[in-house]
């Protein structure tokens, strides 16, 4: 019985040690590549054109460990304001995780934006238009959300992807 308890204790200690050793800081373990920002048309809402801020990027695992259940949260803010203007959540890699050296394509857009009767291009040139920025956060497994990037939203229209 004592031998069984000793084996269980050793296995538990090894598992705890392994879990501690494999904790990867998202700031150093993930790399944002090919970041593209802009304003995406989400169609006509209540008779007006609607534009929302959007960000797309490749999220690369630069660590030497598989990162399970990799998630991304984008928080959009208008320049000069501290409060959240909108947010978007995406799963970059499911339970299989993101292998070392692998990358996932991520594209998210805010649910909030601007509406107007002007054309989409004219809306971006409007003197009352306020620029936006996005903070990108990531987490994997049971780790905490960590900010991995901040980007200005370019004042450009993002064309819809071809079918």
What annotation goes with each model-predicted range?
Residues 59-63:
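Asparagine-centered strand-capping/turn motif at beta-strand->loop junctions
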Residues 1-20:
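Sec-dependent bacterial lipoprotein signal peptides
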Residues 64-84:
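Short acidic, flexible loop segments centered on an aromatic residue
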Residues 21-54, 154-163:
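Low-complexity, acidic Ser/Thr/Pro/Gly-rich terminal tails and inter-domain linkers that flank the onset
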Residues 88-144, 152-158:
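Short, solvent-exposed, Trp/other aromatic-anchored flexible loops in extracytoplasmic proteins
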Residues 51, 68-73, 123-131:
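Short coil-to-beta strand junction motifs in C2/discoidin
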Residues 47-58, 107-112:
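Contiguous beta-strand segments within globular domains
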Residues 53-57, 72-78, 132-134:
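A short beta-strand signature
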């Amino acid at each position: 019985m004592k031998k069984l308890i000793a084996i269980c204790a050793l296995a538990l200690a090894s598992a705890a040690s392994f879990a501690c050793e494999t904790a990867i800081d998202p700031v150093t373990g993930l790399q944002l590549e090919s970041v593209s920002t802009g304003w995406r048309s989400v169609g006509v809402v209540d008779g007006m054109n609607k534009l929302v801020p959007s960000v797309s990027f490749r999220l690369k695992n630069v660590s030497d460990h598989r990162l399970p259940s990799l998630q991304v949260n984008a928080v959009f803010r208008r320049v000069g304001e501290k409060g959240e203007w909108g947010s978007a959540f995406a799963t970059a890699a499911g339970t299989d995780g993101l292998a070392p050296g692998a990358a996932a394509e991520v594209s998210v857009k805010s649910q909030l934006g601007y509406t107007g009767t002007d054309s989409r291009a004219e809306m971006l040139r409007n003197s009352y238009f306020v620029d936006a920025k996005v903070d990108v956060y990531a987490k994997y497994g049971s780790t905490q959300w960590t900010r991995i990037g901040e980007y200005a939203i370019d004042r450009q229209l993002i064309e819809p992807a071809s079918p």
